[in-house]
């Protein structure tokens, strides 16, 4: 058996095509969605990610609002910029690009974001609403994973899912999404401290590798015909991206997401979706 590819690039392209039509319809009503980004410092990866997000905006017709700040920005200066986006009527939603410099408290900064404009779905308010099963912007990577699976015809209701990774951007919120009644999965949350990890992964229909531990899961640790989603991002000394699964899983699994080219494009597509979703809600109910 050679696994089929969970193609994030093609799926994200299809979603962006759908979003472009929705944005065009909004523009016909005089509504122009706007995505803002707050970028602090000169981290090359962060600059690359933000540039990609604004390219995506241009492709679907979303306006870009970019706020770039030096690495030594004070908390008060950052707070002023965030409050400015909260008040900006042209900004439908925005993100504060992480990581922030060490002198800036991340949770403090995220708490300043208007929860209704939280395009990443990662503010404490948004995550709290997710726990309570209340309407809120959904975290982009977990939402992208669910969308990637469903658009490839992977049956989620009743599936046993093993999520390996306990981070607040993927592992923890993904479990909340997958256990909603609309997905109805049974989720086991594991991590790098889990004893006998293979005992859990071998029982799973779907495994999400989100630990950021290269080669953590190999073919001996999965069942025949499993569905594997690789979210882990590590880099070799040569700078090559390496995921949480070893290459031999492709010969045993039914579906595997490539890394890169799997979840990454879906995350960016879901960021756009969160912005367009809010623009449509505002059009339906301006109050």
Swiss-Prot record:
Q: Tell me the superkingdom of the source.
A: Bacteria
Q: Which UniProt keywords apply?
A: Amino-acid biosynthesis, Histidine biosynthesis, Hydrolase, Methionine biosynthesis, Multifunctional enzyme, NADP, One-carbon metabolism, Oxidoreductase, Purine biosynthesis
Q: What Gene Ontology molecular-function terms does this entry list?
A: methenyltetrahydrofolate cyclohydrolase activity; methylenetetrahydrofolate dehydrogenase (NADP+) activity
Signal sequence region? none
Family label: Belongs to the tetrahydrofolate dehydrogenase/cyclohydrolase family.
* Protein's UniProt name: Bifunctional protein FolD
Q: Which organism is it from?
A: Cutibacterium acnes (strain DSM 16379 / KPA171202)
Q: Name one GO biological process term.
A: purine nucleotide biosynthetic process
Under Enzyme Commission nomenclature, its number is: 1.5.1.5, 3.5.4.9
Gene3D superfamilies in UniProt? Leucine Dehydrogenase, chain A, domain 1, NAD(P)-binding Rossmann-like Domain
Query: Which residues make up the binding site for NADP(+)?
Result: 165-167, 192, 233
Catalysed conversion reaction:
(6R)-5,10-methylene-5,6,7,8-tetrahydrofolate + NADP(+) = (6R)-5,10-methenyltetrahydrofolate + NADPH; (6R)-5,10-methenyltetrahydrofolate + H2O = (6R)-10-formyltetrahydrofolate + H(+)
- Record-linked CDD domains: NAD_bind_m-THF_DH_Cyclohyd
Disulfide pairs here are none
Task: Tell me the subunit arrangement.
Answer: Homodimer.
């Amino acid at each position: 058996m050679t696994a089929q590819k969970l193609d994030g690039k093609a799926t994200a392209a299809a979603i962006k095509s759908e979003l472009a039509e929705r944005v065009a319809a909004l523009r016909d009503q005089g509504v122009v969605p706007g995505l803002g980004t707050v970028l602090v410092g000169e981290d090359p990866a962060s600059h690359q990610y933000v540039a990609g997000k604004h390219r995506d905006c241009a492709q679907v017709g979303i306006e870009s609002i970019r706020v770039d700040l030096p690495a030594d920005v004070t908390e008060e200066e950052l707070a002023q910029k965030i409050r400015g986006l909260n008040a900006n009527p042209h900004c439908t939603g925005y993100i504060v690009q992480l990581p922030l410099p060490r002198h800036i408290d991340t949770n403090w900064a995220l708490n300043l974001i208007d929860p209704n404009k939280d395009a990443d779905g990662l503010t404490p308010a948004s995550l709290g609403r997710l726990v309570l099963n209340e309407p809120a912007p959904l975290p982009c990577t977990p939402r992208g994973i669910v969308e990637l699976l469903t658009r490839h015809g992977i049956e989620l209701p009743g599936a046993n899912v093993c999520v390996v990774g306990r981070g607040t951007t993927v592992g923890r919120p993904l479990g909340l999404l997958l256990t909603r009644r609309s997905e109805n999965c049974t989720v086991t949350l594991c991590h790098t401290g889990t004893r006998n990890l293979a005992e859990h992964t071998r029982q799973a229909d779907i495994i999400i590798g989100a630990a950021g531990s290269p080669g953590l899961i190999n073919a001996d640790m999965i069942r025949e015909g499993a569905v594997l989603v690789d979210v882990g991002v590590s880099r070799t000394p040569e700078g090559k991206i390496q995921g949480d699964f070893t290459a031999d899983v492709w010969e045993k699994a039914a579906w595997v997401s490539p890394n890169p080219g799997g979840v990454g494009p879906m995350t960016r597509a879901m960021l756009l979706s969160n912005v367009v979703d809010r623009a449509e809600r505002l059009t339906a109910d301006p109050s």
